[in-house]
Structure formats: structure tokens, C-alpha cells
Amino acid sequence: MASGILVNIKEEVTCPICLELLTEPLSLHCGHSFCQACITANHKKSMLYKEGERSCPVCRISYQPENIRPNRHVANIVEKLREVKLSPEEGQKVDHCARHGEKLLLFCQEDRKVICWLCERSQEHRGHHTFLMEEVAQEYHVKLQTALEMLRQKQQEAEKLEADIREEKASWKIQIDCDKTNVLADFEQLREILDWEESNELQNLEKEEEDILKSLTKSETEMVQQTQYMRELISDLEHRLQGSMMELLQGVDGIIKRIENMTLKKPKTFPKNQRRVFRAPDLKGILDMFRELTDVRRYWVDVTLAPNNISHAVIAEDKRQVSSPNPQIMCRARGTLFQSLKNFIYCTGVLGSQSITSGKHYWEVDVSKKSAWILGVCAGFQPDAMYNIEQNENYQPKYGYWVIGLQEGVKYNVFQDGSSHTPFAPFIVPLSVIICPDRVGVFVDYEACTVSFFNITNHGFLIYKFSQCSFSKPVFPYLNPRKCTVPMTLCSPSS
């Protein structure tokens, strides 16, 4: 009965705007009362839409500001009502022991629970240290106040971590988007050359973005949940600290355990200095190389082969293709002239018909599917040397050979002058070739004394360059198919 009356009174002194108990109540001449802050805010809102018109938010009857008056009577009722927070039934439930029905007056230090005098004498609490609630309330008030300050500090840290993770997420998105833009821009000039590299790098960046942003999004969600948990815990503590002594101590063990068990989880981050940084494959270098190849191709000459009595290579009718005959057949046909296959291999070299005595000259040779070859420039054969010189002995710049070659299908070499200890044997230097060339470009700058070799298959990558060549006499294009019977072909300028 009394509880119902209190409910009715509460409804009468509740603000129709904020639906809370009236604060500094003001009444209009129509009889409706509102919180001072609520009716003031409503008045300002009304002025924005209907100039000069003010009406009651409940009944819409117009009023003038001078007709608003403080309602002291309602304010007193609200003040009294605030003191009556619980109904007798609810008070009975909270203030009395649920097991024994006795009033809760004691606090068990070991179990950190509010108990009655019968609980104190029960087996559950026998031997425990118990105190009157008034004796421990201040101690726990200090503890909870300290915990509240600690939680507020951690909340600030959590909010900062949450902001940092959002900032890092945005930073990653911007940085990776920027990388995408750079990749697209860098590859634009070399689209035909770098289609594969572009696609590969973009896929890596997409995967990196997906993995990192997915992880950061998960971390962000965890940080939001962590922050929300702290807010709820802080709200609980604030409610206890602002409430009665009973509310402060009721269930305090649970909340203290929650505080003690709570740890601030920091999000997983990705140090930018450890990430896989995109590195374009030296786009400027490739562009310069591509331009260099374009430049030297301006000096392309139509080279043909010159048959001679020294070489036993097979030259096609168009004089553009040379191949090695079957060595065993040739040896049987020549009888004792060739004592070994090594001597025979030396005799498969041929010269181009054009002599080079000045200027710049360029040509390309198709060596696809060959397992062995030698090509470059030569100052001319030594007619009497073919019978007594070993396979590679002749291929030295000092003997007029500036050449590179392939052996056993995978070994690319450049032939340089032998050392002072082995003057009759060339110094064979391995070449690092990432993509095996099916087509090789040769460029001779006679005045600059250089011979350059380009991997046309790898977009004109420079294979090797001879510098300070001693061109004391005319030089000729040189091709040697070696013992591989697959032909070598001189490419026409229009190919």
C-alpha cells in the first residue's frame, strides 16, 4: 500500500521532459512543473523554430517568462522522496540476512561479506574476524576510492591505446594506399615490361593490408570491449561510493576480485620498421637500361656470315644461321686430322662478313634452345692455330677475342686474359644471369673501345661490358655454335 503511494507521488514530481525527479522545479500557470534546466532548454529550442512563441511542452498552452515561478512545495516533496529510496519490502530484502532474517550489522574480513549475528556463529564464519560495518566502512571506502582512481588512470590509458590503434589503422591504410599509388605510377611507363612484377607487388600489398588491418580491427574490437568493461566497473564503483554504507559493502568481494583480476591488455601492433617494404625493381635503372637498348638499336646493322675454309660449321644459304655438324661424323670424315673433340669444337667459329673499323654497330643473335655457344667480336682467325690450340685457349682479348659464352646449358662465362702465371689459358669469369637469354644483343663502339652484351629476353639487361678494348685492326662479329647442333641465328633489324 505504502509502496503504491510512493510510486504515485514519484509520478507527480517527475519532470515530463527528462523523466527524472524534478531538480529546482519551476511551474507554469497551467500547473505543470519542470526542471529549471529542462524548461530553459525547451524555451531556447522553441525560440529557434517559432520566434517569440512559448508553450507548455505538455498541454501546449502559451506562457510568458514572467509567469514562471519556483515551486517550493514540489521541491520539498522531491527532497523527502529522495530520502525514501526503497520500499519496506525491498528494504527488508537488503537490510536483513536472506538465510536467517536477522538484520545485517557485521562484516566478515575473511569472506568480505556483510553478515548477521547468526551467520557469525555459524560453521561457515566460525573463527573469522568480524567487525561492525561502521568499523570497516571507512577502510573499504579508501580501498575502493584508490581502486577507482587506478581504474580511471587505466581507462585513460585504454582510451589512448584505443585512439592509437585507430590512428595506426588509418596510418597503415594511408601508407599502403600510397604504396599502391606509387606502384601503379612506377609501372605505368614500363607496363609491357613489368606487368608480372606489378601484379605480384599489388597482390603482396593487398595481402599485407588484409592481414594487418584484419589484425588491427580485431585489436580495436578488443580495446573497445576492454574500455567498455572498465566503464561498467567504474560506474559500479561510483554508484557504490555515492550510495549508502550497505550498498558500498554489499557484494564488495566480487567487485574487488574483478578489479584484482583485471589486467590492461595492450593491442598487437606491427612495427613499421619491420614490415616488408615495397621495393620496385630499380624502375629508374630499368628505364635507363631500356632507353640505352633503344639507343643502341639505332645502330643495328644487317650482319651476315662469311663462309671460310677454316671453320667446319654449317652455314645456311641465307648466311644468317650457323650450326655445328655432328662431331663424331666430322672426326670420322677427317680421319686423323682431329685428334679430339676439343680441337674440333674450336673449328666451329665463324665471322660476320662486315668488318668494323670505326663507329657504332649493333646486332642480335638468337640462341634459344642452345646448351652451348660463344659470341662477340673477333679480330680475325689465326689460320695456322686451329690444330694446336686447346678448346678455350684462343678466347682472350689479347688474342683479339671479346666474347661471352654458355656451357652445359646453365654456365654463362666471360673470357678474359689469363694471368701472368697462366698466360696461355683464359681467365673464365662466371656471369650472373637471372633470366637465361634466348636472344643476345651485341654493341660495339669502336672509338670508345667497348663491347657490350644485352639480354634481350630480360628487357635489355646488360650482361657484360668489355672496356678499354685494344682495337688495333678491324674486328668482325663472331659466332660459335660449339658442339650443340641447335643453330644460332642472326636476327634482321626488322625482327
UniProtKB/Swiss-Prot annotation:
It comes from the Eukaryota. Residues 137-225 form a coiled coil. Residues 187-200 are annotated as: Required for interaction with GABARAP and for autophagy. GO terms for molecular function: pattern recognition receptor activity; ubiquitin-protein transferase activity; zinc ion binding. One of its GO terms (cellular component) is nucleus. It holds the Pfam family zf-RING_UBOX. Keywords: Acetylation, Antiviral defense, Autophagy, Coiled coil, Cytoplasm, Immunity, Innate immunity, Metal-binding, Nucleus, Phosphoprotein, Transferase, Ubl conjugation, Ubl conjugation pathway, Zinc, Zinc-finger. It catalyses: S-ubiquitinyl-[E2 ubiquitin-conjugating enzyme]-L-cysteine + [acceptor protein]-L-lysine = [E2 ubiquitin-conjugating enzyme]-L-cysteine + N(6)-ubiquitinyl-[acceptor protein]-L-lysine. Its EC number is 2.3.2.27. This is Tripartite motif-containing protein 5. It comes from Pygathrix nemaeus. The lineage of its organism: Eukaryota, Metazoa, Chordata, Craniata, Vertebrata.
